[in-house]
């Protein structure tokens, strides 16, 4: 039996900020090859400590700058003929055997932000400049919070479908067996519409007594989101997730978890274990599902419907 037409929908890559690597993976003078958005990139840290990202291939004869290239000052040097490209502008700054540099000797530079332990780049299908900023997480690096735990995994599905899961409270009960799903209030949107914020509440019983727990989830485009939980007075937990398209239907998800030090750090360990199990549960669905362009929603799918409308702004 032939599949319906909307079962073959291939979503493009949405515009936004995406992490290309962890900051700790990029030491001074280090060069990395990265493949994301269906493109080959070179990521490197200049001698002054700046993270830079350029298209991977030299404008001369097409050598891959990330395979044997090296950092020279604020430039990256091609391994083939030693052409040097400025990390910020992508313009060829030096050809060692030629005094006059051709005007077309350049490679595309990517907008970079290094924050929260990640190196982010701005992706836009039409190469337009960024229209919002990467948030700064005050908890990361705060002496009152634990050293962040890190976790990453590749997922064979489009980035939109991963993010959509967060707006689907029913699946938490069916797929993950969670009986204490939070009561979700309305989803709020920033003035420009780029940030969505969900607030939920439930009650948890602990050895220290019963506590009303509040969850706040903020999504900054499709590429990143934060989850903050507040329950025990004076204590908190932060989960930051970054989802980056490698190809349209292959995504790498990275998570960072930190808790206040007045909580036993086992809380962070338990949260990470639950997160890993949750992803494994979802993977059984994700590996075999199709993307419905026009899904049939029922009355209780309110947040899913709102999400589908919200994400439209991130596509050209």
Regions found by a protein language model. Name each.
Residues 1-2, 20-24, 100-116, 211-231, ...:
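Charged, low-complexity, helix/coiled-coil-prone segments
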Residues 1-16:
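Hydrophobic, proline/glycine-rich low-complexity stretches
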Residues 5, 19-140:
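Rieske [2Fe-2S] iron-sulfur-binding domain
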Residues 9-10, 33, 111-113, 243-244, ...:
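A general structural signal for short secondary-structure junctions and capping/turn motifs
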Residues 14, 106, 113-115, 237, ...:
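A short, structural micro-pattern
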Residues 15-17, 29, 116, 146-150, ...:
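Sequence-level motif detector for i,i+2 pairs with an aromatic at +2
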Residues 50, 127-316:
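C-terminal catalytic domain of Rieske-type non-heme iron oxygenases
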């Amino acid at each position: 039996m032939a599949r319906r037409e909307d079962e073959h929908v291939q979503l493009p890559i949405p515009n936004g900020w995406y992490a290309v690597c962890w900051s700790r993976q990029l030491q001074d003078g280090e060069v990395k090859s990265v493949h994301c958005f269906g493109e080959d990139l070179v990521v490197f840290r200049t001698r002054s400590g700046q993270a830079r990202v350029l298209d991977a291939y030299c404008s001369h004869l097409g050598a891959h700058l990330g395979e044997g290239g090296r950092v020279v000052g604020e430039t990256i040097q091609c391994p083939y003929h030693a052409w040097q490209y400025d990390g910020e502008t992508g313009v060829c700054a030096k050809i060692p055997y030629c005094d006059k540099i051709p005007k077309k000797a350049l490679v595309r530079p990517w907008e970079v932000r290094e924050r929260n332990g990640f190196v982010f780049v701005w992706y836009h299908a039409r190469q337009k400049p960024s229209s919002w900023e990467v948030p700064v997480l005050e908890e990361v690096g705060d002496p009152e919070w634990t050293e962040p735990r890190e976790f990453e995994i590749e997922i064979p599905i489009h980035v939109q479908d991963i993010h959509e899961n967060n707006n689907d409270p029913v699946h938490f009960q069916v797929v993950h067996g969670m009986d204490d799903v939070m009561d979700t209030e309305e989803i709020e949107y920033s003035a420009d519409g780029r940030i969505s914020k969900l607030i939920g509440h439930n009650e948890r019983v602990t050895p220290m007594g019963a506590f009303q727990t509040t969850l706040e989830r903020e999504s900054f485009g499709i590429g990143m989101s934060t989850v903050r939980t507040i329950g025990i007075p004076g204590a908190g937990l932060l989960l930051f997730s970054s989802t980056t398209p490698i190809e349209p239907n292959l995504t790498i998800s990275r998570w960072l978890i930190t808790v206040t030090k007045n909580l036993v750090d086992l809380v962070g360990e338990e949260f990470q274990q639950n997160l890993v199990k949750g992803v494994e549960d979802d993977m059984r669905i994700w590996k075999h599902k199709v993307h419905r362009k026009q899904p049939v929603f029922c009355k209780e799918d309110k947040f899913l419907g709102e999400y589908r409308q919200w994400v439209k702004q991130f596509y050209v």
